[in-house]
Amino acid sequence: MTESITIDCLQYAAWSEKIFRQMRQGNVDAVHVTIAYHETFRETVANVEEWNRWFAAYPEVIVNACSAADVRTAREQGRTAIIFGFQNCSPIEDDLGLVQVWHRMGVRFMQLSYNNQSLLATGCYEREDPGITRMGRQVIKEMN
């Protein structure tokens, strides 16, 4: 039997070297990191760039991961794999083509809405629930 992999399935924190090292000490193998709640494309690019600086500064403890193989490799190397995700698809704005751009930039989770109505779907705070929008269906098709 192989050892299990420990994944923190959703995290938002005041990231720092201390936290990165605590994750390693706690044997956290991977973290789904929120890089966008309601940010625009440009604001989210800035978040990715901040993470790229952290990857360069702390390569012994964290690494960007885009696949299950990346997570396994990080674990074998004693590093925590960082997986980018959105809590809301606002960074794709109204441009379907940005789905692929974000995929190439390492985003692997895209939640259609957070709490409020988005261009893609209804959030849990909305009184009426019309579900997934036309654009939401197009984005899902593009993601798949």
Predicted feature locations:
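Substrate-binding cleft of carbohydrate-active enzyme catalytic domains
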Residues: 138-144
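N-terminal hydrophobic targeting/anchoring segments and the immediately downstream early-domain regions
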Residues: 1-134, 138
